[in-house]
Amino acid sequence: MKSPHMPSVHVIATGGTIAGTDGERGVSPSRSGHELIEAVPQLSDRFDATVTQVAQRPSTALSTSDIVAIAETVERAAATADGVVVLHGTDTMAETAYYLDLVVGSDTSVVLTGSQRTATDPSPDGPANLVGAFEAATHATVETGAYVFFNDRLHAARAVRKRHASNPGAYDSGHYGLVAERTPEGLWFYRRPESLSPRLPQSELTASVEVVTTSIGIGGDGLRDAVDRGVDGVVVDASGMGNVPPDVADAIETAIGEGVRVVVTSRCTDGATAPVYGGHGGAAALVEMGAVLGGDLDAHKARMALLAALSAPADIDIESLFDPPLFE
């Protein structure tokens, strides 16, 4: 709902470095969402902000229940606010953004932001990220989908990855490119802002899905252990276009035979999985076994898609979740 007056923004705060202060045992998120908004005068001068504090933790400590609560709060807030902004730790921000892109309504948009430096740092990046996120969330062109705004750049949730552990320019969108960039004259759009993800029903995340990595000399025991624990699905983070060691291939075949859904992704940052290589462990052989290739999604986002699909009240076509996105 776009207001002709001061735009309204609902902020969903979850903790993270943007709320962090230095202590004897390191940085911890101690500042509330209200405190963070009040510390940036440009926000109160231009926006009517309200806040819901969903969590107060590092993003690595968030649970699947937390991200469901974030999604539910986004949906409620979007009914009355001109924009919705989620304050989130950077380590898992891309995962939450992609989950929101999958489950929030088709007429809802949400912008996630945070910081690499604490609020008490001599040169904090949080205030500028907040201002930019508010501007993006209330922009008339940004009407659907989930985004990450960071370091003057707006990224689509499906594309964005954290590529630097500490630099304020932490995120990029790889071969997809930016959605927009903040300039002195406002947001400059490089392509239409839209969701690039399939739509899944929002529900409690009751399924169990794990990520198993592969490497030289690592066999399939990690996957077998996951199956023995009763998981519903496994994402195998493979090499190249989706190739795994022979013993991992054996474990995949066993898992599929026991009803576990297996998605194979690539640890490469660009490109996509493809059923090119045969032989025992090649992606073509894995597809013949019944594995699903994850396309260009990384393992963590593929897990979010599989988790949401397997938790849905109705059957979902798993393979279609990993089709290439179609731009309108």
Residue ranges of model-derived segments:
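ATP/nucleoside-binding phosphotransfer catalytic cores, i.e., glycine-rich phosphate-binding loops
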Residues: P246-E328
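Short acidic, glycine-rich surface-loop motifs adjacent to enzyme active sites
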Residues: A79-M93, R229-M241
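Short Gly/Thr/Asp-enriched flexible loops that form oxyanion-binding sites at enzyme active sites
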Residues: V86-T108, P246-E253
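ATP/NTP phosphate-donor binding region
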Residues: M1-R76, G233, D250, R261, ...
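Internal gly/pro-rich beta-alpha loop/helix module
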Residues: L112-T183
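Short, ordered loop/turn segments at secondary-structure junctions
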Residues: T14-G16, Q56, G89-D91, S115-T118, ...
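Accessory alpha-helical/coil subdomains and C-terminal extensions
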Residues: P7, I12, A39-L43, R158-D232
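Short, acidic/small-residue loops that bind anionic groups at enzyme active sites
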Residues: A97-P127, T138, G257-S266
